[in-house]
Amino acid sequence: SGLSGIGACKLAKSKGHHVILTDSKKINSNVKEFLNSVNISFEEENHSYKNLEWADEIIISPGISKNTDYVKLAIEKKVPIISEIEFASRFTNKPIIAVTGTNGKTTTCSLLYYILKNANLNPRLCGNIGVSFSEVLASNPGDVYVLEVSSFQLEHILKFKPNISILLNLTSDHLDRYNNNKEYYFDTKMLIQKNQNEKDFFIYYNEDNNINSRISNSSKQKLHSFGNLNNSKNTSAWVDDNQLIIKNNKNLFTMLLHEMALQGKHNVYNSMAAGIASKILGVSNDVLRM
């Protein structure tokens, strides 16, 4: 019953669903108090199989493996297993910017949130970064959602469709969960853009062969890439002569690297990704400079 589980319970209950929270461990007493106060049933130190007889869906917490008996039985009984971001995304029609990658997610999300806040776009920062998407939708909705998403959350999406997806990089960390199957891990990260259509945007690092080899020629969405060089038709941010350059349609935004809020080479890439997304959302150059 981590943060995403409690947030999902809250949101589901507020939308009129019958909800049970089930945890194989002991549930914290504060959480129990909250669940009782809003009339949500729970069970602890056990996942009872009888719930699978009536459940329409299971919202799975990121830490739970697909190989547990409970999950295997749910799959056998054809009960859909979804992640909390999949569930939450059904309850908003505001723009979602989802950010994933092996490294740099939190920095990029925080920077993007700061820019959008300065642009008065009323953003919310949520996901894998402290407050779950469901919790924010239930308690404090905004006008645009900056969402940090992990491969664990992407593994169980069905229709989750961000307006803007950002993929920062793909490297072989966190493979223990995937039996050291890096191809499966990389493919899971790519799911961030699988449901996008021609109105949506996919922003990615164009010097990462693990990403490039997975981008299909039939991609429907608008592609915007970033890297050191302006070397392809969809490059939207690059470095030239110690300047960060971001291209939006025909307009160029330039900023000297030493003037940037975040210093360090990896942060140049994080800033490029956040900058491209900001320009797509109509943020002015003056706000970007702040």
Please identify what each model-predicted range represents.
Residues 5, 92, 267:
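Short, conserved glycine- and acidic-residue-centered signature motifs
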Residues 1, 179-186, 220-290:
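Adenine nucleotide phosphate-binding catalytic loops in nucleotide-utilizing enzymes
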Residues 5, 28, 105, 132, ...:
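Flexible, glycine-rich phosphate/dinucleotide-binding loops
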Residues 1-83, 87, 263, 283-286:
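N-terminal leader/targeting and accessory segments in enzymes
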Residues 11-14, 49-53, 62-222, 238, ...:
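Phosphate-binding loop of NTP-binding sites
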Residues 26, 30, 83, 197, ...:
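Short, solvent-exposed coil/turn linker segments
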